[in-house]
């Protein structure tokens, strides 16, 4: 069923493309391994693009030390002063992740999570990342590609909380990381 979900969403299952994945998931209660559908970062962006509602494609980036100027937890508004020099920016530690989109009607949304908030999210939702087995944890996408997973997460959460969602996008977000 996991592969059928990707097909229904017209998203290719190919690790090199990053649209959708079918991953093994150990169901400890039943003692079996089952297929899990996982929506990729490019898949999230592709579905948003297909909706025709966006003036700018939802995007995300890491936030480096000194770049976050202010954050209003009530309105979600954030102000940033991004470091333009790539080499200088790389020297600074990552402190968080931010997603942004603008709709055709002019509405905009920015969604920020600190690195600590993202770490909690990863531990809560990733079975492999919270594994006591060092080999299992080392193989987790959250271990090998933390920044990519974090960027996907802020885009997904920004869309699910703040964007008008097409039926296709609602279905994809609901199915993401579900056992099929």
Task: Enumerate the language-model features and the residues they cover.
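Single-stranded nucleic-acid nicking/binding segments centered on His-rich, glycine/basic loops
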Residues: 153, 163-180
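Binding-interface segments
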Residues: 1-165
